[in-house]
């Protein structure tokens, strides 16, 4: 590294002398440039109808001309931004990252809300299968048992759970943002580089389609989670229990009647 730096500082490259810079500056600039180049390289053009100027828009042929800054480069871009939230590139990059991360959490959360109820309806014993009541089991005398089995995971300390969450999630987020032990950031949002166990980035066209599927399902999951929150507040039941009640008696168990008869605090 020292020999390389000395040769660069004392010779010319492409007819222009290279300025004498400290090795730390060269290394720092190289790291930044490598990350920027890698990030740009991940934006793969696709012949898919979900990318480019001819992509599917939010109202189809009635959508009109999308804003100039929405070029169809990223997954989930339907050319709709009436509030101008994506006009500033830095704000757009930040919001895009937040949306993708929230989409993933919402998909996991929606599965976590429905799956325990589904298992409970098929004979698996839980202390509490309702997603919004399950956490309160930690305050019971017996504590919180995973899948109702104390030999799997048994928790009685809220502080211990909080500490584990902070440590584990902090490690995962740190790995995602910093690029892991190798310090390689190809794209902090998607697999690639040092972390791509399924080899998704090796198939650019298929990977581009998967990104669209992820963002579409993630947006639906965020709406689903909002619906689960409202259901829990209004009916005090989980999503599958509410669905079963509606199927059994759709006339008296529907969103309109429940909403109009809802009294906060009762």
From Swiss-Prot:
Sites where the protein binds chlorophyll b 4: 165, 176
Subcellular location(s) of the protein: Plastid, Chloroplast thylakoid membrane
Chain positions recorded as chlorophyll a 1 binding sites: 80, 86, 99, 219
Pfam families: Chloroa_b-bind
Residues involved in chlorophyll a 4 binding: 217
Gene name of the record: WHAB1.6
Domain of life: Eukaryota
Organism: Triticum aestivum
Membrane topology: Multi-pass membrane protein
InterPro entries: Chloro_AB-bd_pln (IPR001344), Chloroa_b-bind (IPR022796)
Transmembrane segments: 100-120, 152-172, 220-240
A biological process term (GO) from this entry: photosynthesis, light harvesting in photosystem I
UniProt-annotated binding residues for chlorophyll b 1: 58
Textual note on the cofactor: Binds at least 14 chlorophylls (8 Chl-a and 6 Chl-b) and carotenoids such as lutein and neoxanthin.
Binding site for chlorophyll b 2: 104, 153, 182
Entries under PANTHER family matching the protein: CHLOROPHYLL A/B BINDING PROTEIN
UniProt key word Mitochondrion: no
Protein name: Chlorophyll a-b binding protein, chloroplastic
Free-text domain note: The N-terminus of the protein extends into the stroma where it is involved with adhesion of granal membranes and post-translational modifications; both are believed to mediate the distribution of excitation energy between photosystems I and II.
